[in-house]
A protein has these predicted regions:
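Short glycine-rich anion-binding loops that position phosphate/pyrophosphate groups of nucleotides
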Residues: 135-137, 199, 332, 453-454, ...
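Short glycine-rich or small-residue beta-strand-to-loop segments that form or flank ligand, phosphate
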Residues: 6-8, 194-197, 325-328, 504-506
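Walker A (P-loop) phosphate-binding loop of P-loop NTPases
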Residues: 12, 331-332
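Nucleotide-state-sensitive switch-loop elements of NTP-binding domains
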Residues: 1-13, 18-182, 314, 322-325, ...
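C-terminal lobe/tail of nucleotide-utilizing enzymes
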Residues: 51, 182, 186-322, 371, ...
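Short, surface-exposed connector motifs at secondary-structure boundaries
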Residues: 28-32, 189-194, 348-351, 499-504
Length: 597
């Protein structure tokens, strides 16, 4: 056991459950244990069934265990005060105002959450600290930050002494802190990385990709947990027997490719919620249990779930002009597959369609079976696909800004701008700029956005509002200021226009994705954005639920489908669990029957 244990993996693979069960295990062994989540759309409180929030909170029912959810807004306030506080009594008001202006950028939120995360690594109050991280692409970004920011502070100290987080002298201590964090993350004696994956091709692909990326910054994974394995003895009919065989193939591939110790966790016949269920998972996780438990019950019939298909068609297809379709939700609910199906649907109806992914761990290329890059690639005559590549967007953005500046400003000013642009937070600005170009564009009738998991999508959608507020202080010149403000206002208007933009929440019928999607709907509403459709994915077909195990899971789903209708009060489209992951246009076209039936 190392002191620091990180859980990472593709969205929806069960990271929070495995991290929580691990924390419970060590707490029950008598070790003072803390579990911290760095996911902005945390499910920790949902899993433990108690309020946690942005403070270290005792977990009810487990001695020695505390938990905390790092809330970005609260972390930002704390971070700003930590930087500015010591100067309030000794510096003039204009200097304080300048510091506050520097710390008002959207990138400060990312930095603040990261800074709070490092605080836990430097504390000495706990024997074990378990980190439940955001889905893989965002976790990689988090773990790269100590290196990126340390380099940026060092380079800025040689130049103007300014960073986007303020003068170097005010954050020099942070550089030392980030250097220490980097050393800790690379220390195998003190830190363990555990990848959680499902026995599915896309999950394996994501795990291998993330493992390679971590190695480039000197971090090696310690082991893997393969979660959600179908028990062989319940796969009696062909539908599940074929799924079982497919899973076993992926499990063998994973153990050959990753060459790390692997723990196998079986799918349960009900969802994991509450301390008792987590203790059972902890027992299985650390005992190496090789059998699944099944609750015996009397089979009861449930009606199939009916959706309003014509209304869905009207929502997704433009009557005039262009339309943007956003698909968001918890990781692992099938956003990418549904986005690809929607794109194929619109393109086959004669609309020129662009599929855009904003997820750093994007895999639309694997689903479409084409190579997707930072420029739109042709899939069919009416369908193109593109990935918002943060590094490519950063290079393009930096080049454009500097080219525009040459001739308008002095060489010293251009050099200072280049130094500022080398900040890691410029990558976020560049990716956002690319994102809004696709919203503004007029080249396509339908633009489908396959977004990152919920918390990061809400962050992306907040950016037009954040940057609009900052234009006053960030842009010089009345003409430039008015142009920038008008651009952000137009983006906000497009996002709020129900005729031009449709927000679709994707979930599967279990408590955690329902609660996360509901919170996302409320957050969007607060920003003036109305959700128009809920897509309930992975519904078990009644005809394949021929035993207690799958009968129990279907009854659970039907109960939650009724809850979805009541809670959201929106049209609901149901998608069945597919026998295999769709790959390529033929498989996606076959899946269109879920819309047409």
């Amino acid at each position: 056991m190392t002191r620091y244990i990180f859980f990472s993996g593709k969205g929806g693979v069960g990271k929070t459950t495995m991290a929580s069960a691990t924390a419970i295990h060590y707490a029950m062994e008598g070790k003072k244990t803390l579990i911290v989540t760095t996911d902005p759309a945390s499910n920790l409180a949902d899993v433990f069934e108690q309020k946690i929030g942005h403070k270290i909170t005792p977990v009810k029912g487990v001695d020695n265990l505390h938990a905390m959810e790092i809330e970005p807004d609260a972390a930002t306030r704390e971070y700003k005060e930590r930087i500015i506080g010591p100067y309030r009594e000794v510096m003039p008001e204009d200097v304080i105002a300048s510091l506050e202006e520097n710390l008002s950028g959207p990138c400060t939120t990312e930095m603040a959450s990261f800074d709070r995360f490092i605080d836990f690594m430097e504390g000495d109050e706990d024997d074990v600290i378990v980190f439940d991280t955001a889905p893989t692409g965002h976790t990689i970004r988090l773990l790269e930050l100590p290196v990126d920011w340390s380099k940026h502070i060092e380079e800025s100290a040689k130049g103007t002494g300014q960073t986007c987080l303020g003068p170097v002298q005010t954050i020099q201590d942070s550089k030392d802190k980030y250097d220490r964090a980097t050393a800790l993350l690379k220390d195998h004696e003190r830190t363990t990385f555990i990848f959680v994956m499902r026995p599915e091709e896309l999950s394996l692909y994501e795990t291998l990709r993330a493992s390679r990326e971590l190695k480039t910054i000197g971090i090696d994974s310690g082991e893997i947990v393969i979660n959600g394995i179908l028990p062989q003895d319940v796969c009696e009919i062909d539908f599940f027997r074929r799924k079982y065989e497919s899973q076993q193939k992926v499990i063998n591939e994973a153990q050959t490719a990753i060459k790390k110790p692997a723990r196998h966790m079986f799918l349960r016949d009900n969802e994991v919620k509450g301390i008792d269920a987590l203790k059972d998972v902890a027992c299985d996780l650390f005992s190496g249990k090789k059998a699944a438990s099944i609750t015996k019950s009397e089979p009861r019939a449930h009606p199939d779930f009916v959706t309003d298909t014509p209304e869905v068609q009207k929502m997704w297809l433009p009557e005039r002009g262009s339309k943007a379709l956003f698909f968001t939700g918890k990781g692992g609910v099938g956003k990418t597959t549904i986005s690809c199906i929607a794109s194929v649907y619109a393109s086959q109806r004669g609309f020129k369609t662009l599929l855009v992914t904003t997820d750093p761990a994007a895999h639309i290329g694997e689903v479409l079976d084409v190579k997707v890059g930072s420029e739109p690639v042709r899939v069919t005559d009416n369908l193109h696909a593109v990935m918002v590549d943060q590094e490519a967007a950063f290079r393009q953005y930096k080049e454009k800004v500097l080219n525009d500046a040459v001739g308008k400003y002095s060489d010293d000013m251009v050099a200072a701008m280049e130094e500022e642009l080398n900040s890691p937070c410029t990558e976020e600005m560049a990716a956002f700029n690319k994102f809004i170009q696709f919203i503004e564009g007029r080249d396509y009738d339908v633009v489908v956005f396959d977004t990152a998991p919920t918390g990061h999508t809400l962050r992306l959608l907040d950016l037009p509002f954040d940057y609009a507020k900052q234009v006053e202080m960030m842009v010089s010149g009345d003409e430039m200021k008015e142009e920038a403000q008008n651009r952000f206002r137009e983006i906000i208007n497009i996002l709020r226009d129900r005729e031009r933009t449709v927000f679709n929440l994707v979930l599967y019928p279990e408590s955690t994705p329902i609660l996360e999607s509901y919170r996302a709907m409320l957050d969007l509403k607060e920003a003036g954005i109305e959700t128009q459709l809920v897509i309930a994915n992975m519904i078990l077909p009644q005809e394949v639920c021929a035993n207690d195990f799958f009968g129990n899971r279907r009854r659970m789903q039907m109960k939650h489908l009724e809850e979805i209708k009541d809670r959201f009060n929106l049209p609901v489209m149901g998608f069945p669990l597919l026998e295999e992951e769709p790959r390529g246009l033929d498989a996606l076209r076959k899946s269109l029957s879920s819309i047409r039936s």
